[in-house]
């Protein structure tokens, strides 16, 4: 199963409030808490991508964020999307 994980800027390792305006970024594989998530999902699951976005950017640009995230999810052919 191909999994994509969405994290905010803090849990994605970008920083705190000073990075809250960061637009959507993509990283290959598991980042931060995604490493534990991958273990918990078991051998059948592989966390193929992590999406990271600043909290303030997400609130102020919801439509653009959703469109960009869906584009990446579809392109990656993910079976599961986990936010948080």
Predicted feature locations:
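Metallocofactor- and cofactor-centric catalytic cores in central/energy metabolism, strongly enriched
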Residues: 1-84
